[in-house]
Amino acid sequence: MDNIKLQKLTESISESDFGLSFKHTAYFNPRLRTTGGRYLLGSHDIEINPKQFEKFGETALIDIIKHELCHYHLHIQRKGYKHKDADFKKLSQKVGAPRFCAAIENYEERANYIYKCLGCGETFKRIRKVNTRKMVCGKCKGKLHLHKHIK
């Protein structure tokens, strides 16, 4: 799917589920890493993470678009567009927009380092490096050492 098809899909979802037109731009942003999409308050554009579409397909993409359109339409109408606002919760429930999307990679897949406790032998996966002079094992308070650098 390209940006033109995404734009048309967003416009059609806006018309069918919200009964309102989407007058701005929706596009894929490959720089998004930890979020499914985002609504830009300044430009009113919607950015979508292309990895979500690649991994989970069109149904996940539609859910993300619905979620971002909730932000969009509420912000345009000067209502509560944040996740905590009652207007947002009510509208997202009405249109069936999920609160979260599935993670592209889980913590285990993102881990770069494996630490091992010298006391009990427990292993810990971490994304970032840990200061082994300060950090100790959570089980036995033993000393940690870098067992393996994965990536």
Swiss-Prot record:
The keyword Ubl conjugation does not apply. GO terms for cellular component: cytoplasm. Its cofactor is Zn(2+). Keywords: Cytoplasm, Metal-binding, Zinc. InterPro entries: SprT-like_domain, SprT_Zn_ribbon, Uncharacterised_SprT-like. One of its GO terms (molecular function) is zinc ion binding. It is found in: Cytoplasm. The active site is at E68. It comes from Staphylococcus carnosus (strain TM300). This is Protein SprT-like. GO terms for biological process: response to stress. Binds 1 zinc ion. Pfam families: SprT-like, Zn_ribbon_SprT. Belongs to the SprT family. The keyword Cytoplasm applies.
